[in-house]
A protein has these predicted regions:
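Conserved catalytic network of the ASCE P-loop NTPase/AAA+ motor domain
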Residues: 9-13, 35-38, 65-68
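ATP-dependent NMP and nucleoside kinases share a basic, alpha-helical "lid"
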Residues: 26-41, 50
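Conserved acidic residues
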Residues: 16, 40, 73
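Switch II (G3) loop of P-loop NTPases
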Residues: 2-32
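Short amphipathic alpha-helical segments
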Residues: 31-34, 56-57, 87-88
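C-terminal lobe/tail of nucleotide-utilizing enzymes
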Residues: 64-147
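Conserved phosphate-donor/acceptor-positioning beta-strand/loop module used by diverse small-molecule
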Residues: 40-49, 76, 114
């Protein structure tokens, strides 16, 4: 299929890290990637909704069931919370997080939470995400680079 063709027909050169952004869940694309590409680990990105947590749990279990178990390097929760810029109060707009429970159940040591932050959206839209002074993003990058 398209995933295998993408992997075999592109001259990748010398690559230290490759991130493959996939649809959530355990469908054909994630299964093909895990079975066909030389995957050393996965970073699972989620959000705090209950249904999403169930899907992520299933996807993490799928990595464990591969003939060559693929380790989950980190769980990253996107849109985890909103911190009011006026009063610093944290609001869990999409509900409470389940990321710690999933991490504990599957032995994932690295857990990161990204806030809902209009500054991040503006930086991405402007093509200037690398200039973004975001402690949460810096912490995630440092954790992943240390793996």
């Amino acid at each position: 299929g398209a995933v295998k063709q993408f992997w075999t027909d592109v001259i990748w050169g010398d690559v230290d890290y490759m991130f493959v952004d996939m649809p959530p869940g355990t469908g054909d694309v994630p299964l093909t990637v895990l079975q066909s590409l030389p995957v050393d680990g996965v970073v699972v990105v989620t959000s705090p909704q209950e249904l999403v947590s169930l899907i992520v749990e299933k996807a993490v279990r799928m990595t464990e069931m591969m003939p060559r178990k693929v380790p989950v390097l980190a769980l990253v929760e996107n849109m985890s919370y909103f911190k009011c810029p006026d009063c610093d109060k944290v609001h869990h707009i999409y509900g409470e997080s389940h990321i710690e429970e999933i991490a504990a159940a599957h032995g994932v040591d690295t857990v990161c939470r990204l806030p809902i932050d209009p500054t991040i959206a503006r930086a991405i839209d402007a093509g200037e995400v690398e200039k973004l002074p975001c402690d949460e993003l810096a912490a995630i990058a440092e954790k992943l680079l240390a793996l």
